[in-house]
């Protein structure tokens, strides 16, 4: 155990934690250059180690990962005896594969300083150095990472049975599959701690039911920690169900003005830039080049996966060769996501990650200098998470959100109310209309070479609009205010797509582009061959349909229409009888008797009404006869 801290030690010193941290943990954080704890670590670690349930809300980039990893490791290594084989001591649940992988890597780095755990984790033959052997009774932490898409559930179970890990780090779905196996045990005698990282994100992604199923498989007597940059009402529901008298830790940031309720790091400069739709994508390079030194790692956020796919082909034309653009979104296969994520992390030249909100939460991407929100997020809560990819762990960072002139500028005041103030981007940027036109033509030149790019652009534009229309700040982001033609030119579209929002649009849907659409081809030969076949089939089917309609219209007699009308009436009557029959069958005897009495009463009323009508007709006829008897000149008709 680490020695007691000397008098006068800062309350944020690692040596000041009570109960004291192990010597090897102190060595680990010292080797990483963490001379003292962050505020969230200083608050959460002692509580979580002292057998308290915790709900931790702290700004992004504030060191939440170590706030739960250190207590988990310390707890498992202070047990009276090792956890039994195939029993689990702790579980850490993450919303995304990338975040789970990152937590796993941090844990491995930490356990490298604990020889028994390091020896258990390192596969034999990994290097030539002899492996130190420890007895079976030695306490150690052995983690397993569970990720959907990279391994099968059967492979996960096989690894679990072979290595008997006592800590699981996983996304919800794959974790539930493993816990459903009868070979995996989480009894109260073994299970100690559950951590939900980015808890509100877990619920936003629709994992609530899965989480509830997981909680039902875990003992109620456990320590639970919820960690997030924002705690939503949905998280409060999980708190009520899954935590016992939790301690809430809320860490705020004190800015230079003394305001203490900012929700983002003080080292992060959050700005906005107003730009017309036609100039939006053209402003990206000037933003990058106006900052000194030039950002080495930048993240561009857009609203949809389709947008990432399309802009990944278009933006390099505008950014030039100075920046490497790397796409990443949630619909990429798992291996592609991991490959592109690693490319960005390990890049040694100025690089840009073009992504969706899959990268907005939890990921500790080192040395991100700049975040540009090309599309403001639909959910305002996501805004601070996006910004927080820069300015992490005290590092200086800049974030920029792009807004259209007009009503969208009200977003600045909206963010101020939400305690996430933004200031104007400090470097003036000027784009001319001629520059915008040149960029549009350059994009269209590329798109005209392959119809697949046109299809991708149409899909991306429609999906962007759907996202825009669902913005929670709908009074600010109004579809009715959009300049369709300017947007079409900005995106480099060859025409505006067909969609309900353009039903009343009276402008130029072709965007001034003259193109031979019938001969506009795909680069992929198989796809182009199929397109031509479909065109031919459509032409033949259209001709046949026209011929059939003509023959049908010539041969249909008026009497057939009468027959059809009679048949329709007959079907309606039969349907009514069937409904009445089903209703009668569902009645009780009492209800049937009451229905009979009601029917009898109605029949009596109808009969009386009919008798009254017959009497009135008779009286009327008698009156007319009397009048006729007194009229000698009454016309009797022709013979």
From Swiss-Prot:
Lineage, opening ranks: Eukaryota, Fungi, Dikarya, Ascomycota, Pezizomycotina
Occurrences of domain Helicase C-terminal (ranges): 283-437
Disordered, as annotated region: 536-639
Coiled-coil features, chain-numbered ranges: 521-624
Protein known as: ATP-dependent rRNA helicase spb4
Domain spans labelled Helicase ATP-binding: 45-249
EC numbers on record: 3.6.4.13
GO biological process: assembly of large subunit precursor of preribosome; maturation of LSU-rRNA
Compositional bias per record (Basic and acidic residues), positions renumbered to this chain: 575-622
Gene3D superfamilies to which the protein is assigned, alphabetical: P-loop containing nucleotide triphosphate hydrolases
């Amino acid at each position: 155990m680490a020695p007691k801290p000397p008098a006068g030690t800062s309350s944020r010193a690692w040596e000041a934690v009570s109960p004291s941290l192990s010597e090897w943990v102190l060595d680990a954080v010292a080797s990483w250059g963490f001379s003292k704890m962050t505020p969230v670590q200083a608050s959460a670690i002692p509580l979580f180690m002292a057998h308290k349930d915790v709900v931790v809300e702290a700004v992004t980039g504030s060191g939440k990962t170590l706030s739960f990893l250190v207590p988990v490791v310390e707890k498992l290594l202070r047990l009276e005896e090792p956890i039994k084989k195939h029993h689990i001591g702790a579980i850490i649940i993450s919303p995304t594969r990338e975040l789970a992988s990152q937590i796993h890597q941090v844990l491995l780095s930490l356990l490298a300083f604990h020889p028994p755990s390091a020896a258990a984790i390192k596969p034999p033959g990994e290097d030539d150095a002899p492996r130190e052997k420890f007895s079976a009774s030695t306490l150690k932490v052995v983690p397993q990472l569970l990720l959907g898409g990279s391994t099968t559930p059967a492979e996960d179970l096989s690894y679990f049975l072979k290595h008997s890990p006592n800590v699981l780090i996983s996304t919800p779905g794959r974790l539930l599959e493993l816990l459903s196996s009868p070979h995996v045990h989480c009894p109260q005698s073994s299970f100690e701690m559950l951590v939900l990282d980015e808890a509100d994100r877990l619920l936003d992604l629709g994992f609530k039911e899965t989480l509830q199923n997981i909680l039902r498989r875990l003992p109620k007597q456990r320590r639970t920690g919820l960690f997030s940059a924002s705690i939503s009402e949905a998280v409060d529901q999980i708190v009520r169900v899954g935590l016992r008298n939790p301690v809430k830790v809320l860490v705020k940031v004190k800015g230079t003005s003394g305001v203490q309720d900012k929700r983002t790091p003080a080292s992060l400069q959050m700005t906005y830039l107003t730009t017309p739709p036609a100039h939006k994508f053209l402003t990206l390079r000037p933003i990058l080049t106006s900052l000194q030194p030039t950002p080495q790692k930048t993240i561009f956020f857009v609203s949809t996966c389709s947008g990432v796919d399309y802009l990944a082909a278009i933006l390099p034309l505008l950014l030039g060769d100075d920046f490497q653009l790397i796409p990443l979104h949630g619909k990429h296969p798992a291996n592609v996501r991991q490959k592109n994520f690693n490319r960005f992390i390990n890049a040694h030249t100025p690089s840009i990650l073009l992504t969706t909100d899959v990268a907005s939460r939890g990921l500790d991407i080192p040395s991100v200098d700049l975040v540009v929100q090309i599309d403001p997020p639909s959910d305002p809560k996501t805004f601070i998470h996006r910004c927080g990819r820069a300015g992490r762990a005290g590092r200086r960072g800049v974030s920029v959100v792009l807004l259209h002139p007009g009503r969208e500028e009200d977003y600045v005041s909206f963010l101020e109310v939400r305690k996430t103030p933004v200031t104007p981007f400090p470097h003036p940027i000027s784009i001319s209309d001629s520059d915008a036109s040149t960029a549009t033509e350059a994009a269209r030149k590329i798109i005209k070479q392959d119809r697949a790019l046109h299809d991708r652009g149409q899909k991306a534009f429609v999906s962007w609009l759907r996202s825009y229309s669902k913005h929670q700040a709908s009074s600010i982001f109004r579809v009715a205010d959009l300049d369709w033609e300017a947007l079409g030119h900005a995106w480099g579209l060859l025409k505006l797509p067909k969609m309900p929002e353009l039903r009343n649009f009276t402008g130029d849907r072709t965007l001034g582009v003259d193109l031979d659409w019938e001969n506009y081809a795909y680069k992929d030969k198989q796809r182009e061959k199929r397109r031509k076949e479909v065109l031919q089939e459509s032409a033949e089917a259209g001709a046949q349909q026209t011929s059939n309609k003509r023959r049908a219209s010539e041969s249909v007699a008026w009497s057939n229409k009468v027959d059809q009308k009679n048949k329709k009436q007959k079907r309606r009557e039969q349907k009514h009888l069937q409904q009445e029959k089903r209703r009668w069958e569902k009645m009780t005897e009492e209800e049937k008797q009451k229905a009979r009495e009601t029917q009898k009463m109605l029949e009596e009323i109808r009969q009386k009404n009919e008798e009254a009508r017959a009497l009135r007709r008779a009286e009327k006829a008698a009156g007319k006869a009397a009048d006729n008897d007194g009229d000698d000149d009454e016309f009797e008709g022709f013979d």
